[in-house]
């Protein structure tokens, strides 16, 4: 069953169950039994406030299917919840190469680009951007277009992003990059693959 993505209202999944039950009944009336039902993904994550609900409502999600989905004996249900599981687990960490002050727009040019996280360039998706260095300095806020170093006009992570006053060498975190980040990265313009750190790696280094 193909369903849309980024759903946070669980009522939509109840409606999906109703529709699947109708389709199931159509098959039953013709003595056709499906081995499994794949309900896809769809469970959304919050790109705008990644710290408010870092873990999706899995318990309520599975409970809903368990209650409302009318399965045949032995029939399996498959879920594809990749984004909901890993999106909030990863951030793209980048360093500011230059700050360019324009007449109307200030730019923060970082060393990461569309080659590392293509979602903003590909379909203008939003990712929260944080200036970790500026937060530590408690600097005043300003607006920046945050762009990468790839020679493409689409190499932009965000326009008019409100950030602490930014300077060369500042460290940025581009949030919710755990899904569709590294897996969609490329070597375009001879860009090398960036190193990926996991919490397990850090724990090993401390041991």
Residue ranges and their predicted role:
Residues 9-16, 46-60, 87-98, 159-162:
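Short glycine/threonine-rich loop-to-helix capping motif typified by GTGT followed
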Residues 6, 16, 30, 50, ...:
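Generic signature of intrinsically disordered, low-complexity segments enriched in small/polar residues
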Residues 6-19, 23-26, 111, 135:
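Active-site pocket-lining/capping segments in soluble small-molecule metabolic enzymes
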């Amino acid at each position: 069953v193909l369903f849309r993505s980024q759903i946070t209202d669980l009522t939509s999944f109840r409606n999906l169950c109703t529709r699947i039950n109708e389709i199931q009944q159509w098959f039953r009336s013709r003595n056709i039994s499906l081995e499994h039902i794949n309900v896809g993904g769809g469970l959304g994550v919050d790109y705008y406030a990644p710290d408010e609900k870092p873990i999706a409502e899995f318990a309520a999600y599975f409970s809903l299917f368990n209650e409302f989905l009318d399965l045949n004996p032995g029939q399996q249900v498959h879920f594809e919840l990749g984004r909901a599981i890993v999106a909030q687990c990863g951030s793209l960490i980048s360093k500011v190469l230059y700050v360019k002050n324009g007449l109307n727009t200030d730019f923060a040019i970082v060393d990461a680009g569309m080659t590392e996280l293509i979602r903003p360039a590909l379909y203008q998706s939003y990712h929260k951007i944080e200036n970790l260095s500026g937060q530590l300095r408690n600097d005043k806020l300003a607006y920046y277009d945050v762009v990468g170093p790839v020679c493409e006009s689409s190499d932009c992570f965000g326009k008019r992003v409100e950030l602490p006053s930014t300077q060369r060498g500042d460290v940025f975190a581009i949030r919710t990059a755990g899904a569709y980040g590294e897996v969609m990265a490329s070597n375009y313009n001879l860009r090398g693959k960036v190193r990926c750190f996991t919490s397990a790696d850090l724990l090993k280094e401390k041991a």
